[in-house]
């Protein structure tokens, strides 16, 4: 329910933080093989941002959208890295990345429709923010799956090929 200028300002603010995180995370991710801590930080940032929108949307709106934007940008960059971590063969890595991005974009294609439908149904964005919060928390739980022990390194592939 905001006017065009303030809402556009929030969108721009979110976009700035998305770009910063998307550029920063790959550099930070090079420091170690386990990407789960960075992924957890990015998902926690989103969770705090969505909870802020749910509980105090007018008190600190720039903080909430900055956290959400940072988390979204970081997650996108890290999702590209995680798919490459699991496959060292360029063809397999490309196939996995295409699958992950394809499914991700299909899921994201539903988000605007679902948000609009929930807003039309309830008269506010609160239910959409709840859905997003639950989704991000579920993703946070799933980060445990991305253990470096499951990564396929070049040396492991060579060991299997030599047998």
Label every PLM stretch briefly.
Residues 60-68:
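Paired small-residue
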Residues 74-88:
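Intracellular juxtamembrane helix-capping segments at the cytosolic ends
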Residues 146-163:
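Intrinsic disorder in cytosolic terminal tails and internal cytosolic loops
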């Amino acid at each position: 329910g905001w006017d065009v200028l303030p809402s556009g300002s929030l969108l721009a603010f979110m976009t700035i933080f998305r770009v910063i995180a998307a550029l920063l995370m790959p550099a930070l991710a090079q420091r170690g093989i386990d990407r789960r801590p960075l992924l957890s930080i990015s998902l926690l940032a989103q969770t705090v941002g969505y909870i802020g929108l749910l509980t105090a949307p007018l008190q600190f709106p720039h903080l909430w959208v900055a956290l959400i934007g940072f988390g979204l940008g970081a997650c996108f960059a890290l999702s590209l890295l995680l798919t490459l971590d699991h496959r060292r063969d360029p063809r397999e890595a490309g196939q996995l990345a295409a699958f992950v991005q394809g499914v991700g974009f299909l899921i994201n294609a539903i988000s605007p429709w679902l948000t609009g439908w929930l807003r039309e149904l309830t008269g506010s964005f609160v239910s959409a923010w709840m859905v997003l919060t639950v989704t991000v928390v579920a993703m946070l739980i799933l980060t445990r799956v991305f253990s470096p022990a499951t990564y396929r390194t070049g040396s492991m592939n060579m060991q299997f090929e030599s047998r």
